[in-house]
């Protein structure tokens, strides 16, 4: 096979795969990962709202956050300096599309079940559902759970078994609304004492409900909760990946929405990054053909750009 044939074959195979970041096996996702600086800034603890339209890499970077290898790969590739060591981040997948990244834990609550629980409620009531979601997923995360007293661990393990049920999660919080905050306070003290950061991640929120008005209510409640937790705790954050249209609608739902601007990161691609992204998989397929400088994908310096 000639060099030309090798290149054509590599180009034809670029698009092969599942085509959706949530379904691609982790090894494949990391192999094709080409992060940009705005994606790496997602790792800053106080960036609690991540905005990006379709195709900007929200789900890809969301999944990278959940992996030790993924976090280190993103920071190493972009060169963005972080205040917090990514190795000391305890990432907890709080909500995503249907199945969890860990196939051994319960699925996320279904949209119909969520709608049934929050219908006719206000933003304050939806916060309780999201509190239940966070605490249930905490109960399914061994390393985060180990930071808590034994009595809290036992309660959360039981709650974790009901993580797929929106009704049970909401009822658990409604039974004693002070209990989840007391547990989070204890988690914050333990994490701070060990130099750790516990981060609850949320993605695919457009699939949390089937009706647009319910989505606005749910996202508004989640953003309100995330803002309050960032004020109350030193080492606990909610990190929410959101489409611009959902952000706009949800911002109307609670009075402090304007204060989220300082906690916001928008995923942005420069034109040069798009060109590099186009050639990156081609280069990966042709390692035996292209050797040397073409395999080095460092971003140009300011001087080189000129």
What are these regions (language model features)?
Residues 14, 33, 37, 65, ...:
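Generic structural signal for hydrophobic core residues of well-folded globular domains
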Residues 31, 37-55:
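Pre-Walker A-like glycine/lysine-rich segment at the N-terminus of P-loop NTPase domains
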Residues 5-18, 191-200, 306:
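Extended alpha-helical coiled-coil/bundle linker/stalk regions that scaffold oligomerization
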Residues 46-47, 53-198, 208-213:
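P-loop NTPase nucleotide-binding core
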Residues 30-38, 99-111, 195-202, 250-255, ...:
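Active-site-adjacent bridging/hinge elements
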